[in-house]
């Protein structure tokens, strides 16, 4: 990663001028990934892209993806969103537990289901994700770029944990589960942080 930063810094003006031109002419193609493992809190494969691709994704996520894809989210989808996060999610869970306790005659008798999706990022189906993205991203150029990013790994299944866009894509992928639990099944006490959820 540091070598790719040095290469871009060495020709910064050329690189900055090249990115918009490639995006406008639809000649931009995401490069390859460098893979490594992190071990906190558990062993995870991280795939990081080039510095040039990080610039594209950062701008794309901040200017397009975030606003377009987070609009349909429920309040109790806590991950990777402005004004939310782990503390927001924990506060909501605490409030739900207190409300349940009061509504049930100050009895703590009840159950909480806590679950997660095993190997979540690695199990996301690109074909399903692209259909979900297309529901909310209507500009054809932006949709084409999103699909390029989704398809940019050599693996036929999954999205890289190291991409900024993967955080937003992963939140969207389980959005239908959120709406099913909250609206159709009417689970008041439901919340999700990425692939971890409780009922």
What is each PLM-predicted segment?
Residues 22, 96-194, 198-199:
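Conserved polymerase palm-domain catalytic core
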Residues 1-129, 151:
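Conserved two-metal-ion catalytic palm core of "right-hand" nucleic acid polymerases
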């Amino acid at each position: 990663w540091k070598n790719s930063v040095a290469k871009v810094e060495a020709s910064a003006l050329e690189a900055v001028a090249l990115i918009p031109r490639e995006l406008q002419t639809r000649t931009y193609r995401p490069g390859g990934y460098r893979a490594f493992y992190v071990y906190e809190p558990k062993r995870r494969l991280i795939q990081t892209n080039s510095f040039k691709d990080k610039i594209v994704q950062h701008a794309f996520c901040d200017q397009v993806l975030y606003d377009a894809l987070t609009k349909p989210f429920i309040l109790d989808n806590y991950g990777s969103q402005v004004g939310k996060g782990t503390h927001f999610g924990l506060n909501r869970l605490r409030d739900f537990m207190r409300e349940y306790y009061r509504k049930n005659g100050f009895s703590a008798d009840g159950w909480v289901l806590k679950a997660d999706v095993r190997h979540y990022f690695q199990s996301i189906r690109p074909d399903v994700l692209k259909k979900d993205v297309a529901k909310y991203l209507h500009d054809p150029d932006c949709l084409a770029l999103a699909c390029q990013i989704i398809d940019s790994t050599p693996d036929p299944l999954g999205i890289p944990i190291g991409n900024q866009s993967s955080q937003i894509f992963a939140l969207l992928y389980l959005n239908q589960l959120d709406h099913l639990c909250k609206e159709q099944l009417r689970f008041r006490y439901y919340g999700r942080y990425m692939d971890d959820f409780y009922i």
